[in-house]
From Swiss-Prot:
Name of this protein: Thiamine thiazole synthase 2, chloroplastic
Gene Ontology molecular functions: cysteine-dependent adenosine diphosphate thiazole synthase activity; iron ion binding
Post-translational modification: During the catalytic reaction, a sulfide is transferred from Cys-224 to a reaction intermediate, generating a dehydroalanine residue.
Keywords associated with the record: Chloroplast, Iron, Metal-binding, NAD, Plastid, Thiamine biosynthesis, Transferase, Transit peptide
Residues at which substrate binds: 102, 122-123, 130, 195, 226, 241, 293, 303-305
Presequence positions on this chain: 1-50
Modified residues (2,3-didehydroalanine (Cys)): 224
EC number: 2.4.2.60
InterPro entries: FAD/NAD-bd_sf (IPR036188), Sti35 (IPR027495), Thi4_fam (IPR002922)
Domain of life: Eukaryota
Entry cofactors: Fe cation
Protein source organism: Physcomitrium patens
Length: 356
């Protein structure tokens, strides 16, 4: 089997381990993509420019003409679909706040159940958080084993080393998981939308207060600009750490007295940090689950720096906590049986794993 794509002159070929033979998940699940040093760069034979890869109709690039359209049609199509999404998710099952690596992994895992409506709120125009690059603006992404099994599932190629794998560019992970996630009909990503506050009923989080991110950033320069709301059975807070938008979910819980403190993350310790983040991903108050680096903020555990496996697995664990809260089958209760049952690894400090 030939892996799709070539990396900087190095062909990537699948390496199949005996432990993964017979996997029933997606076509490349259980296949490790490793660099083959003897491989030669091969240029695919591309057809002449045509109207479609599946059509013999040729382009005339000197006289290319698009079909005519009214400008109002473009406006109407965008507006109608967005408003329909807002109406659909005004009362939704799960709201994921923050579309970084943990939030995207959580939403991806949730989206496997087509009956669960998932809304993702991201204050930036560009989702992905810090997962577009590795550390110090370098390109490569390091993922410690056994979290590489999640990469196998979503078919991200990597170079396999002894205790970890390396993705040649972090954007391969982020773009791949987004393309798979957003193609699913039960998921909507709301870019450039900020979660300004929480909806609280009694002692339970029941949704989020939303606004356009540019409005949220300019309340001090304009007159009153009231928000919107999104009710949800479960809110997953994956707001990361540091900065004005970091850990906003747990900081708000502290300000209203629902939790005692948010001590902030400790100094870097990769080995302690990743295990702790996955282990302590949890429902901190009824209706609100915390995942990713926001866990380190609320627990005062170490930061982990530029290694990303805990973000992926913490996101998966948060998804199964949300399914549990919804009363649905989940991996934590051992009754998870989706149509496609990928291998799931829940890392912990004592190296316990749950396999599919």
């Amino acid at each position: 089997m030939q892996a799709a794509g070539l990396a900087a002159g190095v062909a990537f070929a699948p390496k199949i381990s005996s432990s993964n033979v017979g996997s029933s998940s997606s076509s490349l699940a259980g296949v490790r993509m490793v660099a083959s040093p003897k491989a030669q760069l091969r240029h695919a034979r591309l057809p002449a420019a045509s109207a479609s890869m599946y059509s013999d109709a040729k382009y005339d690039l000197n006289n290319y003409k698009f079909e005519p359209i009214k400008e109002s049609i473009v406006a109407r199509e965008m507006t109608r679909r967005y408003m329909t999404d807002m109406i659909t998710h005004a009362d939704t099952d799960v709201v994921v706040v923050g579309a970084g690596s943990a939030g995207l992994s959580c939403a991806y895992e949730l989206s496997k159940n087509p009956n669960v409506k998932v809304a993702i709120i991201e204050q930036s125009v560009s989702p992905g958080g810090g997962a577009w690059l590795g550390g110090q603006l370098f390109s490569a992404m390091v993922v410690r084993k056994p979290a590489h099994r999640f990469l196998d599932e979503i078919e991200v190629p990597y170079e396999e080393l002894e205790n970890y794998v390396v993705i040649k560019h972090a954007a391969l992970f982020t773009s791949t998981i987004m393309s798979k996630l957003l193609a699913r009909p039960n998921v909507k990503l709301f870019n450039a939308v900020a979660a300004e506050d929480l909806i609280i009923r009694g002692d339970r989080v029941s949704g989020v207060v939303t606004n356009w991110a540019l409005v949220a950033q300019n309340h001090n320069t304009q007159s009153c600009m009231d928000p919107n709301v999104m009710e949800a059975k479960v809110v997953v807070s994956s707001c990361g750490h540091d900065g004005p938008f970091g850990a906003t979910g747990v900081k708000r819980l502290r300000s209203i007295g629902m939790i005692e403190s948010v001590p902030g993350m400790k100094c870097l310790d990769m080995n302690a940090a990743e295990d702790a983040i996955v282990k302590h991903t949890r429902e901190v108050v009824p209706g609100m689950i915390v995942t990713g680096m926001e866990v380190a903020e609320i627990d005062g555990s170490p930061r982990m720096g530029p290694t990303f496996g805990a973000m992926m697995i913490s996101g998966q664990k948060a998804a199964h906590l949300a399914l549990k809260a919804l009363g649905l089958p989940n991996e934590l209760d051992g009754n998870y049986k989706p149509n496609v049952h990928p291998e799931l690894v829940l890392a912990s400090t004592d190296d316990e794993t749950a396999s599919a």
